[in-house]
From Swiss-Prot:
Top-level EC class: transferase
PANTHER family linked to this entry: FUCOSE-1-PHOSPHATE GUANYLYLTRANSFERASE (PTHR15045:SF1)
Taxonomy of the source species: Eukaryota, Metazoa, Chordata, Craniata, Vertebrata
Activity at various pH: Optimum pH is 6.8 to 7.8.
Key words of the record: Cytoplasm, GTP-binding, Nucleotide-binding, Nucleotidyltransferase, Transferase
Subcellular location: Cytoplasm
Record-level Gene Ontology MF annotations: fucose-1-phosphate guanylyltransferase activity; GTP binding
Disordered: region residues: 1-21
Name this protein carries in UniProt: Fucose-1-phosphate guanylyltransferase
Annotated disulfide bonds: none
Keyword Cell inner membrane: no
One GO term describing the cellular component: cytoplasm
Tissue-specific expression: Expressed in many tissues.
Length: 607
């Protein structure tokens, strides 16, 4: 789990006079949220906010879904007005990674604005994945993941805009690049601010354990003369390492000695990795590039024409920067999911393009980084983690109709924009969003229920994942509900039918599940690439004419596996998750959410 608590304390009398780091962090975060709340639905003045907010999409279906949701948000005045909001879609064909998406976005900006964008502050949010590790975000996008916060509720987009609210005021024209599924919180001095005003690239850096460093980018900073660490430091960077081994961190002098670090300054996934005298490194999150650097990358992209390999905005752009950068990394493909023949050559071209460009680092010594991109992280942060709950003011019941929630062993359930009967039970550790649950529904612990409608008697086993989608098939409205275990690995794939026994559904051998459902093992059982067979491409989810029938039918197949009792799927039209996303009816899903919103609003006004 990528949960990182980063904190350095100043020594001496200064530390004694200040609030504890966790208090400063909470107050700074709440101030940003209040400021953003004031701007929602208001016309912002030039320079007060971003000139452009751009979101990347993987394909045209995702582009349409994002544009529909942005349109609804603007209509409901949930976002600042007077800002240009865009969705930029990757070109059809080979996957190009977030680096390729960045290049594509630059080209889109040039086409839309010509030379005008050289005076704009631009936020670019990468949200072009299919969220296979958190599938309730697959249909409508990671950047539109609902949070238990705000009225109307915040989604990740609003939270990003809130946390970065101070940036545009202190930024030269250029582009801030970030991802859709992480949260950066930080606290700095009352009269300090983060400046993005240097030429080249500027990145935020956070102190982290060496273990966390192996899954992030790590900065090799130039020596620092000041004996006291401050909340905000501007540092120069010698070179950038992408997901290095601990051995490499030491080899390239990326490791800092403990000094003023305290063990309580780390939390979440770092606790087990740290000792009181732990060494640490500075890891990455978001980065900024000035307009000159952006234009240089754009000229490069227009020269090469079409990309045929995945480029990483962090691994391939940042590793080329700083005086200590060397070309060796271009041949290291150990962190690459799919190795294309052109990848090494493309990396080398990018290296020679960017070599000599400066990499400036803004060190935030009292900061936190949260990644919410998996079912495990999602459940933990929304139901169990008191730190994030305190910092953001997360609630157990957010804009919902539901009785009080009991707490058990520090865990609560989390209900987001849903209507639940008072006799319905939801066990601690579970999240319910955009759903209606009747009086005879019981939800076990550690479940995720999304977009569902259950009025009949139903028991959802612990650790269930249930997410319903509206579909448009042959111009008819249909529904399908994906159901499996929250710990199932949807990305794990095998190459042949004989190996599908290696896949697991709800912790049970997938081959055994097919027997329970009376389904035969044939190539037709899977959609898409027939040499990449996975739960993601398995045609096992029934298509139904109503939302409630869809949920109940999928729950029957889930319970059949749990209880080892037969439930034949032979009579149903079956889809894979991959196909459900192709047929998804975004408009109907938004309408369903809007109906819940209006009903809650009406009942709240009568109370």
């Amino acid at each position: 789990m990528r949960a990182v608590r980063r904190g350095l304390r100043e020594g001496g009398a200064m530390a004694a006079a200040r609030d504890p780091p966790e208090v400063s962090l909470r107050e700074a975060t709440q101030r940003k949220l209040r400021r953003f709340s004031e701007l929602r639905g208001k016309l912002v003045a030039r320079g007060e906010f971003w000139d452009i907010v751009a979101i990347t999409a993987a394909d045209e279906k995702q582009e349409l879904a994002y544009n529909q949701q942005l349109s609804e948000k603007l209509k409901r005045k949930e976002l600042p007005l007077g800002v240009q909001y865009h969705v930029f879609v990757d070109p059809a064909g080979a996957k190009i990674g977030n680096g390729g998406s960045t290049l594509c976005a630059l080209q889109c900006l040039e086409k839309l604005y010509g030379d005008k964008w050289n005076s704009f502050t631009i936020l670019l949010i990468h949200s072009g994945g299919y969220s296979q590790r958190l599938p309730n975000a697959s249909a409508l996008g990671k950047i539109f993941t609902a949070l238990p916060l705000g009225n109307p509720i915040y989604q990740m987009l609003e939270l990003k805009l809130a946390m970065y609210i101070d940036f545009p005021l202190n930024m030269n024209p250029g582009i801030l690049v970030t991802c859709a599924d992480d949260i950066e919180l930080y606290s700095i001095g009352e009269f300090e601010f983060i400046r993005f005003d240097k030429p080249g690239f500027t990145a935020l850096a956070h102190p982290s354990s060496l273990t966390i460093g192996t899954t992030h980018g790590v900065f090799v900073l130039d020596p620092f003369d000041d004996l006291k660490h401050r909340d905000l430091e501007y540092r120069s960077c010698h070179r950038f390492l992408h997901k290095p081994s601990i051995e490499k961190m030491y080899q390239f002098n990326a490791v800092c000695r403990p000094g003023n670090f305290c063990q309580q300054d780390f939390a979440g996934g770092d606790i087990a990795d740290l000792k009181l005298d732990s060494d640490y490194v500075y890891t990455d999150s978001l980065f900024y590039m000035d307009h000159k650097s952006a234009k240089m990358l754009l000229a490069f992209y227009e020269k090469i024409g079409t990309l045929s390999c995945e480029i990483d905005a962090y691994g391939d752009f940042l590793q080329a920067l700083g005086p200590g950068a060397t070309v060796e990394y271009t041949r290291n493909t150990s962190n690459v999911i799919k190795e294309e023949s052109e990848l090494v050559e493309m990396r080398q071209r990018i290296f020679h393009l960017l070599k000599g460009t400066s990499l400036n680092v803004v060190v935030l010594n009292n900061s936190k980084f949260y990644h919410i991109g998996t079912t495990e992280e999602y459940l933990f942060y929304f139901t169990s983690d008191n730190s994030l709950k305190s910092e953001l003011g997360l609630q157990s019941i957010t804009f919902s109709i539901f009785p009080d929630i009991p707490e058990c062993s520090g865990k609560t359930s989390c209900i987001i924009q849903s209507i639940l009967d008072s006799r319905c039970s939801v066990a601690p550790g579970s999240v319910v969003e955009y759903s209606r649950l009747g009086p005879d529904v019981s939800v076990g612990e550690n479940c995720i229920i999304s977009g569902s409608y259950i009025l009949t008697k139903a028991a959802l086993p612990a650790h269930s994942f249930v997410c319903s989608l509206s579909l448009k098939m042959n111009r008819c409205l249909k529904y399908a509900t994906m159901a499996f275990g929250v710990q199932d690995n949807l990305k794990k794939s095998v190459k042949t039918l004989s190996d599908i026994k290696l896949l697991q559904f709800f912790g049970v051998c997938f081959l055994s599940c097919l027997d329970v459902w009376n389904l035969k093992v044939t190539e037709e059982l899977f959609s898409g690439n027939k040499t990449c067979l996975s739960l993601w491409t398995a045609r096992i989810f029934p298509v139904c004419s109503s939302l409630s029938d869809s949920v109940i039918t999928s729950l029957k197949m889930l319970n059949a596996v749990k209880n080892k009792s037969a439930f034949s799927l032979n009579s149903y039209k079956l889809l894979s998750i991959e196909e459900m996303l192709i047929y998804k009816d975004v408009e109907d899903m938004i309408t369903y959410r809007e109906q819940i919103f209006l009903e809650i609003s009406l009942k709240s006004s009568l109370m």
